[in-house]
Amino acid sequence: MEMNQKTAFMGINIKDEGPSNVMIIKALNSSSSLLDIPSFMKVAGIEFDPIMFNHFWQVLVDNGDRLPHVGETTLNWLGYEGVFTKQKEKFINMLKRNQISFKELSYQDNEIQLYPSIQKEMLLLPNESAKTKSKWLLMNPDDFKMAIMGLKTKNSEKIKRYYVTLEKTMKLHSEYALYFHDRKAQEEKERERQRAEDEKRSILGEMSEMRQYMQKMGITLEDTREEVKKVNIQNKDIKAQNEEIKAQNEDLAFDLSDVRDRLIEAAEDRSPKLETKPLRERFVIIKRKDSSFPYYAIRGQDVYVKGRLTHFKNTRYPELKIIFDTNYQPNPRNLYIRFKELKDERFIIAGNNIKTVDSSNKLEKEMLELFEKLNEEKHNIYFFFNFNDF
C-alpha cells in the first residue's frame, strides 16, 4: 500500500489528502450527518428516479428467508404489457428459456400470510375459485438480476442503464461513507487531544493555586503529612464499623431469604384454580405433518382446547401429537404473547403457526424449553428492599 493510502475496502483506497472525486467532496461538505443513498444521489447530481430506485431497492435487496414477491406492479415496471395473467405467463416463459430459478405459492400455502402484497392481490380476485387457481411468483435477488439482464421489453434498456448507474452509485457511496467515518474519527481524536490539553492545563493551574495558598497560610509539607495520618486512622475506624454493619445486613438477608421461600410456597394461590375443570385455562402446542409450519399453538379453556384437538385429528391431522401441555395456565394468551415478544430468530411465527429455522430436533427441544421457562415465570416473586428502611 502506498504511504498516502490509509486503508482499502472493497477495492476503495482512503488517502491522507482526501478524496479527488468531485461528487464525494460535495457530499462530504453538504452535511455533518451521513447521507443515505437517495440523498447522496441528489447532492452529487446523479439522476434519481424514485420509481426506478424503489423497485430496485425492494426487489434486489436480500430480505433473509423471505423471497421478494414479483407482482403486477413489478411486471409493469419491467415493461410487460397486456393483462396481468399474460404478463406473468410471458415472464415465466422467459425465465424457463434462460433456466432462471423461481418459486410459486398457491392459495393453500401458509407462507402467503408473510406477504401483504399477495394478500392485496387476493382481495381483487372475483371469487373463491379464482383464488384456488391463482399462483404468486417469488424470486431471490440474484435470480431477479439475471432476469433483468435477459429482458427484451420496451423498458429493458432503460432498466439496464439505471442498474449500471446504481452499481456505480453504490461504489461511490461506499467511498464517501469511508471518508465520512474517517473524518469523524479524526475529529474525535482532535477533540480527545484538546480535552487532554485542557485537563492538563486545569491540573497545573490548580497545583499552582494550591502552592500559593499553602505559602500564604504558612502550611508546610510536614503539616500536610500529619493531617493525612490522622485521616488514615479515622478511615480504619470507619472500615471496622462498616464490617460490623455488613455482618448485620447478612443476617437480615438470611431472614429475608426465609420469608421469600415461604412466599414462593404460596405462589400457586395467586391465581386460584376454577372448580369446574372444563373452564380452566389451558395452553397446548401440537406437532403435525405440515411442511410449512409443523407446530401450532392452541390456547383457551380446557373444553375449547379439547374441541380443537378433536377437530384437527378427525379432519386434517390424524397423526398430530401434543408436545407441550400446561395442566393449568391462568393466562395462556399472556404466555404466547411473551413468546412472540422475544422475537427469537430461531423461530418464525405466523398467527398461531410456528416453525423453526431448520427442522432439527435440537431447535424443537429448545423451543419447548423456552415455553417451559416462560410458564414457570408465573412463580417468580421479586423483592426490592432498601436496607436504610430497617
Curated annotation (Swiss-Prot):
Q: Which domain of life is it from?
A: Viruses
List the InterPro entries hit by this protein, alphabetically.
DUF3627, MSV199_dom
Q: Which UniProt keywords apply?
A: Coiled coil
Q: Which Pfam family, any one of them, does this sequence belong to? A: DUF3627
Coiled-coil stretches, from where to where? Answer: 181-263
Q: Does the keyword Coiled coil apply?
A: yes
Q: What is this protein called?
A: Putative MSV199 domain-containing protein 211L
